A protein has these predicted regions:
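Ferredoxin-reductase
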Residues: 1-33
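Gly/Ser/Thr-enriched, mixed-charge loops and adjacent short helices
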Residues: 25-114
C-alpha cells in the first residue's frame, strides 16, 4: 500500500500468501492513494466480467515495468513513527513477514529488542 500512494500509482495488486493451502492464496487490490478495492468498488464488476465470459479489451498503450527498491523510501516513513520506547519491553515475532527487513534498522542490534 505504501508504494501505491508514495509513488502515485493508479492502482496496485499484491499477491498474498496464506497459512492455508495454496488454493486460498489471493490478491489485495488497491486504487489511487492506496484506497482499497472491495466488492462494491470494483471487485464485483470484475467477478461479473469473468463470469460472463466476455473478452478483456486490449489496452491501447503498453505499460512499463520498473524495478523500484521501495525500502529506501519506506524506512524513513516508518522511522517517523518511532517514539521514545525506553522503559518498554517489546516482544516481536516477525516470522516470515516483511517486517523482518526493517527490525534491525528500527530497533538496532541490541538483542533485548528482539
Amino acid at each position: 500500500y505504501f508504494g501505491t500512494a508514495f509513488y502515485g500509482f493508479n492502482a496496485s495488486v499484491q499477491i498474498t500468501a496464506s497459512h492455508n493451502p495454496a488454493e486460498y492464496n489471493g490478491m489485495k487490490v488497491s486504487r489511487e492513494n492506496a484506497l482499497p478495492v472491495g466488492y462494491d468498488t470494483g471487485l464485483g464488476q470484475i467477478k461479473e466480467w469473468i463470469e460472463s465470459g466476455r473478452e478483456c479489451p486490449v489496452a491501447q498503450k503498453r505499460g512499463e515495468v520498473r524495478q523500484i527498491d521501495v525500502r529506501k523510501d519506506y524506512l524513513p516513513f516508518l522511522l517517523k513513527y518511532k517514539g521514545d520506547w525506553s522503559g518498554l519491553k517489546i516482544a516481536m515475532d516477525v516470522s516470515n513477514g516483511m517486517a523482518s527487513l526493517f527490525v534491525r534498522d528500527i530497533f538496532g542490534d541490541t538483542p533485548s529488542w528482539y
